[in-house]
Amino acid sequence: MNLKKFKYKKVSSTNDIAMQKIRQGYKSGVIISDKQTRGRGQHGKKWVSNKWNLFFSIFFIINKKIQTSTLVISNLRIIKKILSNYIKSKIKIKRPNDITVNKKKICGILNETLFYNNLKFLVIGIGINIVSSPNIGDYPTTNLNEVTNRRVSKTKLLNKIIKAFDIKIKWLL
């Protein structure tokens, strides 16, 4: 499957735009934005979207029988594996939906489902701190450039993740 990319400078939320695209008739795609004004995390928590970090949502049709709650960990494992190509430090999955490096959050995902035209869609919102570490209260954060001591290409990282999910999608149809 070839995921169509939709690129934006600023959106309310990449997951919201993905759901709009589904309602417009798109069956799959990737929403990419430089900035989110109302990004969200688990249980409606605000997702802080600092400029230069990576914010995107992948959406596609899945088999109606699949329990999407079981997909969160497998989605995190895909991201963790790709990040491990860049990071030498200990990377861990922190339930329910984060990835940490040295006990600091570097990534979060949000899985949402949408039933539309008798089809079940999965929308996976992904945020990865690449350049800056947002201040989110008592939860320490880090970023990819900080833990690698080098500049990481946002585009190359995004393309690796899209390729990995493109392979996974074939198993979920």
What are these regions (language model features)?
Residues 1-85, 89, 107, 151-152, ...:
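N-terminal lobe of the biotin/lipoate ligase/transferase fold
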Residues 145:
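Structured alpha-helical
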Residues 131-140:
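Cytochrome P450 core scaffold surrounding the K-helix E-X-X-R motif
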Residues 149-173:
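Conserved, helical-rich catalytic subdomain that frames metal- and/or nucleotide-binding sites
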